[in-house]
Every structure is written in C-alpha cells, then in structure tokens.
C-alpha cells in the first residue's frame, strides 16, 4: 500500500475511533438513568440534536459514497436513539419529550423530502445537504457557549465533562484533517468551532481545576 493510502486509512480509523469515543460518553448518562431510574441532571436535547445530526451526515455519507461517514454516523444514530428511548422510559414528563422528538423528526422528514424529491441534480443535492449538515454541526458546537459565562461567574467547572471535552477535541481535529485531505469544506469547516470550543473548555479546566472547584463550594457554604 502506498504512503498516501496508509495515511488515509490511519486518518479514517482515527475519525471512527475518536468519534465513537465521543458518542460513548453518553453511556455514563445511560447508566445513571438505569441506576437511579430517573433523568435528574441529564439534558434531553443534546441526545436529540446529535441524533438528527448523525442521520443528516449519514445521508451525506451515502450520497457521497464515504464509508467513514457511513460507519460513524450509523453507530452514532443507533447510540443516540438508545439514549433517547432510555430517557423517554425514565422521564416523568413524557409529553414534552415526545413533542420535541416529533418536531425534530418532522423537520428531518421535510428535509429528506426536499433534498431527495425537489433537488434532482446529484451535485446540487450533495452541496445543499453538505451546507445543511455544516450549519447544523456548527450550531451544535457553539450552542454551549452560553454556559461558559456561568462557569466563569461561578468559578466552577462542575457542569463540564473533562472526558467529553478531550473526546470532542480529538474528534473535531481528526475530522478537520480528514475533510482537508478530501478537499471537502463541508467536513472541514464545521469541525473548526469544535476545536476552538474544546480548547476554551480546557483553558477553563486549567483556570478552575476540580480541586479549586471543591474549595470554592466549601467557601460558599
């Protein structure tokens, strides 16, 4: 195998490994729900939006014929659906959960209908779907920024997951390089905010380490 082929294979494997590692961080929430039989301190919307994101990128991967995208997002969609079903099972407010799920599913179905029925040209469909996936992914990476102000205000990183931050950093970096290698801006660009937000979170962990977090809470009590 040529050097370029080895590099591409290694990069593809890195994307799969790091992304599945990021998705698997939700397993701790799943175990918490099973152990406590409740959804206390667990947010539902990230599961739902990540599932929609996975299904969108899965469609892009199928249309593009990219096996790496197909594998990663197929497994991701299955895991996120599992988290959603568990949340629905243990949540006492099932009506709100079902309403949010139905709303995003309706949007997803409308999107599929538009891309597959009203955009017959394959290249135009690929570009428009790639643009949609990129914008959706960027919005997901930037949405937690509002929480960062609260972290600075409280001087506490309790609401942040260190393992998820590391996984997101490696995941975003590997996909950015992968997209650059393929010369696909729809893959490269949306992962750059993921690198940026992960570095910001790591900076907050350095500024407000867990030990300081505990001392600060003791002073507050």
Curated annotation (Swiss-Prot):
Domain MtN3/slv: start-end pairs: 10-94, 127-212
Instruction: List the Gene3D superfamilies hit by this protein, alphabetically.
Output: 1.20.1280.290
Q: How does it sit in the membrane?
A: Multi-pass membrane protein
Q: Which compartments does it reside in?
A: Golgi apparatus membrane; Cell membrane
Q: Which GO terms describe its molecular function?
A: glucoside transmembrane transporter activity; sugar transmembrane transporter activity
- UniProt entry tagged with the keyword Disulfide bond: no
Output the Gene Ontology cellular-component terms: Golgi membrane; plasma membrane
Residues covered by region (Mediates interaction with TRPV2)? 149-221
Q: Which UniProt keywords apply?
A: Cell membrane, Golgi apparatus, Membrane, Repeat, Sugar transport, Transmembrane, Transmembrane helix, Transport
Give the residue spans that cross the bilayer.
3-23, 43-63, 68-88, 102-122, 129-149, 160-180, 186-206
| One Pfam family matching this protein | MtN3_slv
- Give yes or no: UniProt keyword Membrane: yes
Induction info: Up-regulated in mammary gland during lactation.
Tissue specificity is: Expressed at high levels in lung, placenta, spleen and thymus, at intermediate levels in brain, heart, kidney and testis, and at low levels in bone marrow, liver and lymph node. Within the thymus expression is highest in non-lymphoid cells.
The family line of this record is:
Belongs to the SWEET sugar transporter family.
Q: Say what the protein does.
A: Mediates sugar transport across membranes. May regulate the expression of RAG1 a gene involved in V(D)J recombination.
Record note on quaternary structure: Interacts with TRPV2; the interaction probably occurs intracellularly and depends on TRPV2 N-glycosylation.
Q: What is the name listed in the Swiss-Prot or TrEMBL entry for this protein? A: Sugar transporter SWEET1
Origin organism lineage: Eukaryota, Metazoa, Chordata, Craniata, Vertebrata
